Amino acid sequence: MEAGYTSVFAKDLFKGQVVIVTGGGSGIGRCSAHELASLGAHVALVGRNLEKLQTVQKEITEDGGSADFYVCDIRHEEAVKATIAAVVAAHGKVDALVNNAGGQYVTPLEAISVKGWEAVVNTNLTGGFLMARECYLQSMKARGGAIVNIVADMWGSMPGMGHSGAARAGMVSFTETAAVEWAHSGVRSNAVAPGNVASSGMDHYPPEVGKMLVSKFPSSNMCPWGGLRQRQK
């Protein structure tokens, strides 16, 4: 990887590996893709927005990395099956999956419609399950691999976003189950809750939400990055 992006980890840490990143067109997914590519991985970007995926692929290749992209709505089973099949056909395997795609909106429980509830749960839970299952069945069951599920800090629940809190808690349980059931195939399954990150995802929230997060999580109570972590790149 040449000038433009430099990782803090060892060079070529993931050389020769194929890693899928969902939600790879923006925010945490975009930054994860850059990090993985800088460490030698070929990154398969998955998302719904073609233009965003093309932009991130271009960024990575201009930095000297390797990436391609697949337009897919992870909420749809057949689309997920076809996407994983396409990745395996192109690269012969899937070494790792970063289940990052997700979304939610601020609203109290009594105002959430069934349509709104299902949209969030299908993205934040069902879609992640489908991606993990197909990566396992189509590649990892025979070769081993790693699954990283990006969740949220929902251990104190998520008032104002109950649909997302329920889905994220479900994803943590799924992660633990997958770690046990798929261990015999050499598959590691972990969940990561990055905390509050100032990325493009914040654009979907009212302006006062960002101010609330900064006041709720002062830098003295956070990791060294400070209160509201700024995504890099």
Task: Go through each PLM region and give its residues.
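Amphipathic alpha-helical dimer-interface segment in Rossmann-like NAD(P)H-dependent oxidoreductases
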Residues: 114, 123-142, 179-180, 184
